[in-house]
């Protein structure tokens, strides 16, 4: 199965010429970065239309990444949620089966191919759960590029397996101890590096966040998820899904799934954030549920802030959702009512992780487990035989130690 590059978008679904989704997005960056962002935007606009670039990208997605990823019917999980009023048909979009074990390689591969054509020999990236770092290190190894990954010290402790994987792949993993030593701090440090080395270095931002053109660019490299999903749904039952479900931290896996269906109003789009220890505790990462509009890492979006407008620290058992901001397009979809956003706690996510493992023999990442956990709330509200597609954004090998420590602490 081949999937063509995503078609031109309507005005409602794309950033405008200033990189804005409604009031969100934009470029709030130091003057030294403006030429680099303009160069990146121009390169992306050119190469997305270039047949040679697209041919190389599609060949690598097929032969190196292993696309298309399967759309798997979770029979026992579906039966678990069936009752008198509803027999849900739950499908998993198996991004966990991609090379490196998550959706992140779609974007890393696309951006490295862009960086090569732009003449950049040094690649930097931030990572939280480590999956974006592993994906970036993997593609840099494939193309012989220097690679530096910024990672918070708390996340390095939580994700030791991925730290070792990155180093085995030849990347330098730079610890970040500022702040709480998590994803926000790693992102800030990566941006500082980029400002200093902008002539030789390309920054592979790992989510649909940051200044324009990153939210658009990252979305486009992940849009293959939704494009494949549409084609697979048509092949399996001749129609579209009723509900799409994905976890949201920065929001790249969700946007990759949602983008193809934004203009299909009959398809519900549901994003699930991390409620951490509870929405009323202050220890959560539910940006779209509890946040206010502000600027972080170069873009206007919803943020977790205090009364003085200072960004506050986020919390989630999942390192990949532990971020106090969110991609600007998600903020836009929330404001126009096109997508719904809810949250689940650490406890609910761990339970959902174990549930999928024991019902389907699939160990999901703790990030993915947040989307799975929302089935507990969603399914009792449904009737009939709704078809639900969940983006299984990553595998859970990296989280086994975290889950073990969680149970030991109970």
Curated annotation (Swiss-Prot):
EC number: 4.2.1.20
Modified residues (N6-(pyridoxal phosphate)lysine): 104
Keyword flag Ribonucleoprotein: no
A family per Pfam: PALP
Required cofactor names: pyridoxal 5'-phosphate
A single GO molecular function term of this UniProt record: tryptophan synthase activity
GO cellular component annotations of the record: cytoplasm
Enzyme class: lyase
UniProt entry tagged with the keyword Disulfide bond: no
Highest taxon, organism lineage: Bacteria
Pathway: Amino-acid biosynthesis; L-tryptophan biosynthesis; L-tryptophan from chorismate: step 5/5
Membrane-spanning residues: none
Reactions performed catalytically: (1S,2R)-1-C-(indol-3-yl)glycerol 3-phosphate + L-serine = D-glyceraldehyde 3-phosphate + L-tryptophan + H2O
Job of this protein: The beta subunit is responsible for the synthesis of L-tryptophan from indole and L-serine.
The protein's name: Tryptophan synthase beta chain
Organism placement in taxonomy: Bacteria, Bacillati, Cyanobacteriota, Cyanophyceae, Acaryochloridales
């Amino acid at each position: 199965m081949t999937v063509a590059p995503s078609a031109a978008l309507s005005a409602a679904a794309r950033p405008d010429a200033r990189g804005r989704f409604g009031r969100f997005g934009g470029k709030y960056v130091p003057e030294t970065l403006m030429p680099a962002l303009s160069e990146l935007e121009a390169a992306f606009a050119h190469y997305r239309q270039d047949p040679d670039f697209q041919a190389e990208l599609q060949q690598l997605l097929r032969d190196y990444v292993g696309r298309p990823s399967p759309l798997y019917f979770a029979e026992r999980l579906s039966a678990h949620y069936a009752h008198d009023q509803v027999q849900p048909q739950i499908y998993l979009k198996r991004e966990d089966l991609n090379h490196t074990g998550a959706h992140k390689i779609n974007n890393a591969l696309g951006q490295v191919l862009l960086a090569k054509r732009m003449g950049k020999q040094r690649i930097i990236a931030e990572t939280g759960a480590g999956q974006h770092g592993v994906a970036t290190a993997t593609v840099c190894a494939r193309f012989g590029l220097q690679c530096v990954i910024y990672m918070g010290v708390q996340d390095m402790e939580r994700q030791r397996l991925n730290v070792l994987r990155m180093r085995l792949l030849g990347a330098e993993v730079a610890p970040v101890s500022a702040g709480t030593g998590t994803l926000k701090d790693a992102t800030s440090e990566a941006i500082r590096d980029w400002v200093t080395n902008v002539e030789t270095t390309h920054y592979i931002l790992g989510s649909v966040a940051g200044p324009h053109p990153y939210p658009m660019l990252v979305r486009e490299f992940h849009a293959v998820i939704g494009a494949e999903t549409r084609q697979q749904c048509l092949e399996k039952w001749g129609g579209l899904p009723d509900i799409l479900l994905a976890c949201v931290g920065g929001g790249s896996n969700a946007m990759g799934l949602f983008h193809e269906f934004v203009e299909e109003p009959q398809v519900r789009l549901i994003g699930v954030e991390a409620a951490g220890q509870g929405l009323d505790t202050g220890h959560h990462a539910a940006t779209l549920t509890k946040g206010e509009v502000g600027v972080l890492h170069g873009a206007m979006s919803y943020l977790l802030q205090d009364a003085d407008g200072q960004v506050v620290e986020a919390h989630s058992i999942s390192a990949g959702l532990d971020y106090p901001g969110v991609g600007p397009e998600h903020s836009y979809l929330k404001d126009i009512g096109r997508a719904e956003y809810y949250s689940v706690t650490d406890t609910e996510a761990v339970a959902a992780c174990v549930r999928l493992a024991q019902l389907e023999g699939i160990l999901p990442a703790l990030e993915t487990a947040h989307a799975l956990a929302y089935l507990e709330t969603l399914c009792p509200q449904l009737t009939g035989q709704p078809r639900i597609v969940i983006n299984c954004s990553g595998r859970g090998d990296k989280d086994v130690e975290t889950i073990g420590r969680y149970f030991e602490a109970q």
